[in-house]
Structure formats: structure tokens, C-alpha cells
Amino acid sequence: MSLPTVAIVGRPNVGKSTIFNRIAGERISIVEDIPGVTRDRIYATGEWLTRKFNIIDTGGIELSDEPFMTEIRAQAEIAMTEADVIIAVVDGETGITDADEAVANILYRTDKPVILIVNKVDNPERRMEIFDFYSLGLGDPYPVSAVHGIGTGDVLDAIVQNLPNEIEEENEDVIKFSLIGRPNVGKSSLINAILGEDRVIASPIAGTTRDAIDTHFVDSEDQEFVMIDTAGMRKSGKIYENTEKYSVMRAMRAIDRSDIVLMVINAEEGIREYDMRIAGFAHEAGKGILIVVNKWDTLEKDNDTMKKFELEIRTKFKFLDYAPIVYVSAKTGQRLNKLPDMIKEIHHAQNLRISSSVLNDVIMDAVAINPTPTDKGKRLKIFYATQVAIKPPTFVVFVNEEELMHFSYLRFLENQIRKAFVFEGTPIHLIARKRK
């Protein structure tokens, strides 16, 4: 289910990033150290009173070539386009500025709820001065000291109160996927080619995200697909459209709404940092991943071309060793007929459930091959394992001491599970828990 979105806006140096980190809490830390992946800090997930939501820091979207006020306005426009709830941040230390008023003037046009935060309210005297901010016309100001964590609970309460009502769970039989990649990798051509392959295409309907267009289609076996697309990629004339961080943010939102991500790479250009960043986000989000190398027809090839390209992919995407690769051409149609079946196979792997008895046989065989590690004379004991979730498949391994389960041994167990069962295209999670 797609999460609602909260966007943070405000001029520089009012403390947007600190507020972002406060709201995100521990969730913004990188749980898994993935070499070569830069985790983008403008997009995170927060949770309060059991409600989860995405947070966007529009201040992370840099428009360095643009005039100062143009950048401020662009941030506000992004918030109005993307968010369910908008947080406007001002500085209680410096008071109201022209830039604050410019943001307020833009936010007057939105029908989205706006929460006004007066940051850097670190003492009672400054708290008395927050009433000046009523003149912005954005409602009751919330006094906050993001550095000290003062007042953030009230802000989180306000966020949750203003989030849209939760919608019912969507049909799990429908496969939702998105095509993600840098500009000019051929996403549009691939979309058109996929939809042109004698599919029964329903009329595009508005998705749960504002201004998003999701395309529903059915294949020859009556499997229903939803192709997630973001209309923002189709808009023109917006000053922030070509900034990389805005593109990253759009991609992250599409990933959030997808079951499976088709990571599209331009064969002519190879893998760039953007690709690694987005792939890392999809991996951490537990999404199914299919690597699609487009424009394969444009390369001059010899017997080793595909082998060399796969080596580059596996070297740079070490954390995606489970993701299948397909080399296609949207222009000629080469191998495009494979995509729907590959997507369905990944969807099947994501939803695969393994009985505890069969799983534990695999675990015990693995331990026989490679005995559990020891630390200071104490050996790790594995009592049993069980599957607790799907999408992605998640297993809990009950042990005598969690600290004895080294990451490398957990990875070994994962590899043995993958050898025993078909989990191609999906991450699987193994969690060590002390048996009580």
C-alpha cells in the first residue's frame, strides 16, 4: 500500500534537515552497509502512533543555477505537487523574512493541510515571540527546537491528524511494477513497446498518488499488471524537472508504490552513480528487481560483449546478485516478449512461502556443511527457523545469542536457502533472534 507523503519547505538555514532527521528518527540510518551506494537523504520513512508516512526534504533539491527566490518558490511548488501534508519551517531566532512570506504566498493556493513550525525556539522568551508568525496566515505556529527535540511530538501529532484516511489493501493478485532509470535510457520507448505487445489495455486511471497515471493491462494468461508512472516526468516547463535530486525523489516514490522495479540501464552509457543510488533504495525497500539493459542493438558486439557487460553489472551492483538481467531493444523489440514472464516469475518468488519443516532441513544441512561460528569459546547454536513474511520473503532464525550470528554466516545461510528454493529477482531477509 502506498504511504502518504509529508513535504518540508522553507528557506535555507531554518533547520529543515534537522527537523527531517527528527521526524524520520532511526529510520534514516543505513541498516545495511552496501558498497557503492549513496543513500539519498531527501527521502525517508517516518512513523508515529502506528501511522507510517514518507517524508521529503525539498531543501535537498538544489537549483544552484537559479536565483534564490526562484529556488524557494520551486521547493514550495514541489511540496504542493507531491505532498498530502506540508510542513512550512521558519526561524524563531531571526523572525519573518521576505523569503518566508514568498513561501506563504505560494502555499495559500494549496488545499493541502499546512503545518507551520517555528524552529530554534530554545527558551521561554523566544516562545513568547512566536505569535508574530500568525501574520503569515498559515495557521497556529508550533514552537520547536529541532536540535533538542522539544516540540516534535506535537508536530508529529499534527501530521498524523492531517494524514489522509488509510485505504483498503489493494488486490494482491495484481502485479505493480515501475520502470526506473536516468533520462534517455529509453523508459518511454520501453513502456510503449510493452503496452503495444497485443495487450488488453484498460483506460489509464488516476492512481492513489496525485497526478500519477497508472496503466492497467492484462496479458494473454489473464494476469493483471499495473505499470506505475509519475506524471511529473511528463510535465514540461517546471524549473525543477531536470535536477537530479528531483528525479531521484520521483523514482523513489514510484519504487515505494511498486512490487517490482525494472532498473533500466542504457547499454551505450553503462552504469552511473544515479543507477546505483536508485538500485540501493529499491533493494533496501525489499522490492523485486529486474535489470533491463536497453539499446542493446546499438552496441558493436563480439563473443564476449554480453559477458563483459554482465561483469560490470555484477561488480557495481554487488548487492543485486539475485536480480536477473535481460538485454533488450525497445527500438527493434529484441527480447521484449520476455519481460512479462520475467516479471511474473519475480512476483511468484516474492510471494513464495516455505514450510518450517522443509526450511529447517535446509538450515541443518547448511550447518553440517559449514559449522556455526564461535566467539571467545562460545559457539552459535541454531534452534530452528521459520518464515514470517513475504514481499520480501523474511525468515527468523532463533539462536542462543544474537551477537554470535556474524553477518557473513547469515549471508551463507541466505545463499543456501537460495540454492534450495527459487528466489530469483527478490531480496530475502534473514533475522537472528534469541530464543526465549
From Swiss-Prot:
Biological process terms in GO annotation: ribosome biogenesis
Q: What does the entry list as the binding residues for GTP 1?
A: 10-17, 57-61, 119-122
Q: Give binding positions for GTP 2.
A: 181-188, 229-233, 294-297
Residues of the KH-like domain: 352-436
GO MF term list: GTP binding; ribosome binding
Q: Which UniProt keyword terms apply here?
A: GTP-binding, Nucleotide-binding, Repeat, Ribosome biogenesis
Name the Pfam families for this protein: KH_dom-like, MMR_HSR1
Gene3D superfamilies reported for this sequence = 3.30.300.20, P-loop containing nucleotide triphosphate hydrolases
InterPro entries with a match to the protein in the record: G_ENGA, GTP-bd, GTPase_Der, KH_dom-like, KH_dom-like_a/b, P-loop_NTPase, Small_GTP-bd
Report if keyword GTP-binding is assigned.
yes
| Domain EngA-type G: start-end pairs | 4-167, 175-351
Subunit-structure text = Associates with the 50S ribosomal subunit.
The text of the family note is: Belongs to the TRAFAC class TrmE-Era-EngA-EngB-Septin-like GTPase superfamily. EngA (Der) GTPase family.
| Listed PANTHER family | GTPASE DER
Described function: GTPase that plays an essential role in the late steps of ribosome biogenesis.
The protein's matches in NCBIfam families, at most eight in alphabetical order, are given as: GTPase_EngA, small_GTP
**Name this protein carries in UniProt:** GTPase Der
In its UniProt entry, the species of origin is given as: Lactococcus lactis subsp. cremoris (strain MG1363)
Name the lineage: Bacteria, Bacillati, Bacillota, Bacilli, Lactobacillales
